[in-house]
Structures are given as structure tokens and as C-alpha cells.
């Protein structure tokens, strides 16, 4: 086996503290160079069949018409299985090793006093999620972990009752946010030494040129996250491959200046949701995002590992310049606990977090071999 395999085997790490445990390996890297797992719709774990529909629900379910009301009554329970992308709380996800949280925020039609997270249907209060993040970082075991907190969509009013309420919610983590004037290309070791508390990269989707919240980075300026909108594993992998092939046409060197989110997620069609009502029709029929993730996550892990460890894209060897982190940074999944893959020439089976830990050790070894270039991820 390669020396990196010995490093992985001999390095003591825990999912709750893996970044700190790998400090000697990833300290010279920027957050844009580290491989880590992200959770798609991280706060959707609270969606249930009784959850009201939110602002991002399909249009035919919204409105005040009798027809829309009837559809909401009929589809609320069915849609819940497809709206719930995670089954663990945010605290449990962080303890599992997730370091990127994708979230949407809106008002709740049944509780105007608080802001809620949502994915087509209302989930848990935003305050609960932020308290989970706060508790995780207050825990001495995980106090040195970095988190990317991405509020992709805000379904809020422009007045103080909307965005103002959102900003006040964020204030409970104000001493945890990494200032926006700190470049994403900053080595993690510098961030560890500069502050014992600031561990969160706050990203907010906004149509404005400047963020109205001082600690927030504008999503379009600091992150690449492309949704390929495919509902089959084959088409999803093809689309993800094509994103990298397109980026390779414009090679870049140095440290990537933006975070890159690989959206390794299946997009259900209305037909999938309808057929899911009758799961006994065929073994091929799935009735929830959980069922889909159970089937596709293992293949997605194998794809991500093959690309990053072996430099293989659909069986073809590719050379990825140091300045491109396409599919080499944040690996976003539904049901992050599902799926495993073989690493280290098939000698070890691990989950997505363990895979990323090994890839970071592998990357660090390449960086050590050639300190004049950003790390490469090819095993051989």
C-alpha cells in the first residue's frame, strides 16, 4: 500500500473532531482545498406529514383557491417523504463529520413569531439549528472544527420584520463568524492561530452586491454550486463529469478562490412521487429521498473517490490544475449517513466522511512532495 494508507491507518481521528485531528495534514490548506461532506437541505429532518407547505413548494400547491387547498390536503403526507433530505439533526450531522450545511429559511404560515427552515415544507425553527451549531462549537471536543453555513435561499420580506429578524437570529453566532475580509485562500493553520472562537464561514444567497449583514459572504461571489437537475444515476454522473470537463477548458493555478459544492443529489420528478404511493408495484419504485439515497449514495461515493484518489473520470485519466477544485471540495449528499466505498486499493471500507479524511491525507502527501504547487489528488 501507499505511505498515505499508513498515515490513514495510524492517524487517530474522530468524526466529531476530524479537522483538528488532521491539523498536521490540512493546516497548510485553505478551506477551498479541503475535501469535506456537506448535507443537502441540512435542516429538513423536521419535515413530517403534518408540516405546512412553504414558499418554495411547487406553485400548484400554493394559493388560496379551493383546488390548491385540496391538493395541499391530498399531497402533504406524500410530499413529506420527498422533502425530507436528512434524517439526523444538525447537531448529529456535525458529530457525524459533516462540515457544510445547506439551508433555506422562510416564515411559517402557522407561526409568524419565528423563522423556520424548510424544503418545500416547513421543518424546524431556525433558532434550533443555530443553537445546534453553537452547542457543537462550544463542545471542547469539536471547538476547533470549521463549518460552512450556507443560507442558499431566504424567503423573507425586505422590511425589518423579515431580513431584520433573520439577522437578529444570526447574532447568536456573531462571535463565531470568520470576518469577510479574511480571504477563503487563507491557510487553516492561520485561522486556528488567529482566533480560538471564529470557526464559521457564513454564506448568504443575495441579489445585492454587498451583504447587509457584516459577517456574511455573498454566495455568488464566494461559491460555485451547480444543480444539474437529473433523476437517474447515470445522467447525474454524466452531468457532473461534464461540469468538470467544461472547467478543464480554462485551467487555473494557485489556490482556488471560491468554495465548490458538488451537488451529488438526485432530483425526483412528479412521476417518481406519484409512483412512490404504490411501492409494491416494483422493486424499482422508491417512495422517499431516503430510499433513493440508499440506492445511489454508494455509487456517488465511488465516483468521487475514483476522481479524487485516482484521477479517473469515466475511466479516463485526467489532470486537474491546482486552481480548479471542481468536485474536489464540498461533497453534498442527501441522507449523509448512507453509503460506503472501498478505499486504499480496496483494503478498507468507509463512509463519506472517512473517504474525505483519507483524500485529505492523500492530498497533503502530494503537497509535501511538491510545495511549489497546490495539492494533487492522484494515487498513481
Swiss-Prot record:
Disulphide linkage map: none
GO biological process, one term: lipid metabolic process
Membrane topology qualifier: Peripheral membrane protein
PROSITE patterns registered for this protein in UniProt: PIPLC_X_DOMAIN
A GO MF label: phosphoric diester hydrolase activity
Keywords linked to the UniProt accession: Lyase, Membrane
Reaction catalysed by this enzyme: a 6-(alpha-D-glucosaminyl)-1-(1,2-diacyl-sn-glycero-3-phospho)-1D-myo-inositol = 6-(alpha-D-glucosaminyl)-1D-myo-inositol 1,2-cyclic phosphate + a 1,2-diacyl-sn-glycerol
Compartments where located: Membrane
Matching Gene3D superfamilies: Phosphatidylinositol (PI) phosphodiesterase (3.20.20.190)
Keyword Lyase: yes
Coiled coil (residue ranges): none
Main location: membrane
EC category name: lyase
Job description of the protein: By hydrolysis of the attached glycolipid, releases soluble variant surface glycoprotein containing phosphoinositol from the cell wall of T.brucei after cell lysis. It also cleaves similar membrane anchors on some mammalian proteins. VSG lipase may play a role in processes such as parasite differentiation or antigenic variation.
Subunit structure and binding partners: Monomer.
PANTHER family: PTHR13593, SI:DKEY-266F7.9
Protein name listed in UniProt: Variant-surface-glycoprotein phospholipase C
Amino acid at each position: 500500500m501507499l505511505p498515505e494508507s499508513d498515515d490513514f491507518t495510524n492517524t487517530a481521528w474522530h468524526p466529531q473532531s476530524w479537522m483538528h485531528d488532521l491539523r498536521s495534514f490540512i493546516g497548510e490548506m485553505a478551506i477551498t482545498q479541503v475535501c469535506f461532506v456537506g448535507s443537502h437541505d441540512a435542516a429538513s429532518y423536521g419535515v413530517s406529514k403534518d408540516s405546512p407547505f412553504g414558499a418554495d413548494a411547487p406553485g400548484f400547491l400554493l394559493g388560496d383557491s379551493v383546488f390548491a387547498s385540496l391538493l395541499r390536503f391530498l399531497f402533504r403526507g406524500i410530499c413529506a417523504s420527498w422533502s425530507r433530505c436528512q434524517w439526523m439533526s444538525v447537531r448529529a450531522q456535525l458529530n457525524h463529520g459533516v462540515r457544510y450545511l445547506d439551508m433555506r429559511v422562510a416564515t411559517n404560515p402557522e407561526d409568524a413569531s419565528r423563522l423556520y427552515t424548510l424544503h418545500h415544507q416547513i421543518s424546524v425553527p431556525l433558532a434550533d439549528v443555530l443553537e445546534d451549531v453553537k452547542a457543537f462549537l462550544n463542545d471542547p471536543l469539536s471547538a476547533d472544527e470549521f463549518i460552512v453555513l450556507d443560507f442558499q435561499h431566504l424567503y423573507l420580506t425586505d422590511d425589518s420584520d423579515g431580513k431584520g429578524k433573520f439577522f437578529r437570529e444570526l447574532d447568536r453566532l456573531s462571535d463565531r463568524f470568520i470576518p469577510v475580509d479574511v480571504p477563503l485562500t487563507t491557510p487553516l493553520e492561520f485561522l486556528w492561530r488567529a482566533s480560538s472562537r471564529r470557526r464559521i464561514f457564513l454564506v448568504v444567497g443575495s441579489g445585492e452586491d454587498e451583504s447587509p449583514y457584516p459577517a456574511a459572504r455573498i454566495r455568488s461571489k464566494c461559491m460555485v454550486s451547480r444543480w444539474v437537475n437529473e433523476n437517474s444515476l447515470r445522467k447525474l454522473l454524466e452531468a457532473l463529469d461534464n461540469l468538470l470537463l467544461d472547467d478543464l477548458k480554462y485551467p487555473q493555478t494557485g489556490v482556488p478562490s471560491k468554495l465548490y459544492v458538488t451537488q451529488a443529489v438526485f432530483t425526483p420528478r412528479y412521476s417518481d412521487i406519484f409512483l412512490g404511493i404504490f411501492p409494491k408495484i416494483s422493486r424499482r419504485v422508491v417512495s422517499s429521498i431516503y430510499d433513493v439515497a440508499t440506492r445511489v449514495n454508494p455509487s456517488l461515493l465511488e465516483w468521487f473517490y475514483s476522481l479524487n484518489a485516482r484521477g479517473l473520470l469515466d475511466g479516463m485519466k485526467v489532470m486537474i490544475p491546482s486552481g480548479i477544485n471542481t468536485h474536489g471540495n464540498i461533497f453534498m449528499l442527501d441522507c449523509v449517513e448512507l453509503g460506503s466505498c472501498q478505499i486504499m486499493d480496496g483494503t478498507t471500507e468507509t463512509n463519506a466522511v472517512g473517504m474525505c479524511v483519507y483524500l485529505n491525507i492523500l492530498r497533503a502527501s502530494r503537497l509535501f512532495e511538491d510545495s511549489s504547487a497546490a495539492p494533487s489528488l492522484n494515487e498513481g
